[in-house]
Amino acid sequence: MSEAERHRAKMEKRKAVQDAEVASKTIEKGLLIVHTGTGKGKSTAAFGLALRMIGRGHRVGVVQFIKGAWHSAERDALEKFGDQVVWHTMGEGFTWETQDRERDVAAASRAWAKAQEMMADPAFALIILDEMNIALRYDYLDLNAVVAAFSNRRDGLHVVVTGRNAKPELVAAADLVTDMTLVKHHLSLIHI
């Protein structure tokens, strides 16, 4: 048997296994996805999922818990899709900028109320809770109540939670967790 024939036979077997695996996955449910870790790209990865949902004709909701007036090109791009994307920036800035726990707790509570409202709205297929992990890390929200709300969310709703230091309870409840690891970042290469 030639190398090309061996390769073809190997790939035919692999295809049969893959096809069987895909065929066995018949349950459609919404996923709870967590993007965490010290690396960059957690929010950007979530916004990539938003593009996939928009491409399928679904509506996406975004609630930003921390970033405040932080401007992003991702927001500019997603807002070009009109009412397919509803964006709420609820935070008042990074916690080291506000330095006011009471204000941060109030902002996180407002953001969580908006998130719950959007999660209950069947018009949305995906809700992105950007930097919610930060609000949970500093106990601005009741972790048990948040996890319970995610566990009891309506069928078919996908929820993505981003931010560093995801709580173990949230990780345990999630269907998919990605830990972004910083290997190299261009900002560390700039010498001022």
Descriptions of predicted regions:
Residues 1-31:
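Extreme N-terminal, non-catalytic leader segments
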Residues 33-120:
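Conserved P-loop
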Residues 66-69, 93-95, 133-134, 165-168, ...:
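Conserved nucleotide-binding/hydrolysis micro-motifs of P-loop NTPases
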Residues 79, 168-173:
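Short loop/helix-cap segments at secondary-structure boundaries that form the rim of catalytic
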Residues 99-155:
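Phosphate-binding/switch loop-helix module in NTP-utilizing enzymes
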Residues 158-163:
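Structural recognition of the conserved hydrophobic beta-strand(s) that form the central parallel beta-sheet
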Residues 172-185:
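A short helix-turn-beta junction within AAA+ P-loop NTPase domains corresponding to the substrate/partner-engaging
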Residues 190-192:
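Conserved small/polar residues in nucleotide/adenosyl-binding loops
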